[in-house]
């Protein structure tokens, strides 16, 4: 079997102001749940997603009304916009004309070759990429007849077929996804894809389920791929508010040290020694740091005896005791604080560390 292409060695592809591939960065994506023709609702949801840390957003384009809304949506958002096209190539042309930063299609399902040529020509003129979205649930009939059922080899063959269509038209700004709802199938398909071509891979476990089940399933599948060095961009697909997809994605990337500017929470699993409401405190602190774009490690621990030593790697933290808390930095106790104010004191110190990071970033920027 061919050698696996590591994410940093994939072909770089520009999507708006971002580059996907050719580096170790993983770009977080999500998808709106609104009707795309409802511009107000769609823009509002995209803004919420951006605030949560989404870097690229995708919208459905099931009809011409949605395609015609792209130009107005694009004017009112800050992050790159991907438009999802199925079957009708005219929707793709209208979306590209409206300023889409990328389109997602299967070249094989938008009709005759002239249709594909028209879409590729429009994408070339605007300098935007195309994502080939292979899905185990919608493989071509001849592949299902050949393999008997959806397999990783069938998915890779489908991807290569669609890639070949674009390459024959001298188009190489391609991103590929290999989605399946079965975790093991998805892992195998992405692994084989990473050995078959060097285009960037968009990771996802499709139809993964509700917030709880989908988070576990996506973390299992995407986490395995990230550890293997596979993937340049990802979406956590959940039957939930899409903001939750972004939160899970950020947390997953933090677990692998792949989120450069994100705060991380350490909290103990609780036991009989705890004398503070650690669970609610941990949830409050987690929510507080979710929007902080600085690599700060924060600890919330329930035991003042072992806490500071156990969280020596944390930049800042609190350990609760009866009626008071210990504020510590890098495992060293800084001061005691009353229990009723210890969370606010922790937040103040987090803000100071974040501001120090932001100041360093500003200093490093060229004038």
From Swiss-Prot:
UniProt KW S-adenosyl-L-methionine keyword: no
First-level EC class: oxidoreductase
Similarity comment: Belongs to the IspG family.
Main function: Converts 2C-methyl-D-erythritol 2,4-cyclodiphosphate (ME-2,4cPP) into 1-hydroxy-2-methyl-2-(E)-butenyl 4-diphosphate.
Binding of [4Fe-4S] cluster, residues: 268, 271, 303, 310
PANTHER family, sorted: 4-HYDROXY-3-METHYLBUT-2-EN-1-YL DIPHOSPHATE SYNTHASE, 4-HYDROXY-3-METHYLBUT-2-EN-1-YL DIPHOSPHATE SYNTHASE (FERREDOXIN), CHLOROPLASTIC
Top-level taxon: Bacteria
Catalysed reactions, semicolon-separated: (2E)-4-hydroxy-3-methylbut-2-enyl diphosphate + oxidized [flavodoxin] + H2O + 2 H(+) = 2-C-methyl-D-erythritol 2,4-cyclic diphosphate + reduced [flavodoxin]
SUPFAM superfamilies according to UniProt: Dihydropteroate synthetase-like, Nitrite and sulphite reductase 4Fe-4S domain-like
Pathway involvement of the protein, from the record: Isoprenoid biosynthesis; isopentenyl diphosphate biosynthesis via DXP pathway; isopentenyl diphosphate from 1-deoxy-D-xylulose 5-phosphate: step 5/6
Keywords annotated in UniProt: 4Fe-4S, Iron, Iron-sulfur, Isoprene biosynthesis, Metal-binding, Oxidoreductase
Cofactor(s) essential for the protein: [4Fe-4S] cluster
Note on cofactor: Binds 1 [4Fe-4S] cluster.
GO biological-process terms attached to the record: isopentenyl diphosphate biosynthetic process, methylerythritol 4-phosphate pathway; terpenoid biosynthetic process
UniProt-recorded name of the protein: 4-hydroxy-3-methylbut-2-en-1-yl diphosphate synthase (flavodoxin)
EC number: 1.17.7.3
Entry-linked InterPro entries: Dihydropteroate_synth-like_sf (IPR011005), IspG_bac (IPR016425), IspG_bac-typ (IPR004588), NO2/SO3_Rdtase_4Fe4S_sf (IPR045854)
Keyword Zinc: no
GO-annotated molecular function: 4 iron, 4 sulfur cluster binding; 4-hydroxy-3-methylbut-2-en-1-yl diphosphate synthase activity (ferredoxin); 4-hydroxy-3-methylbut-2-enyl-diphosphate synthase activity (flavodoxin); iron ion binding
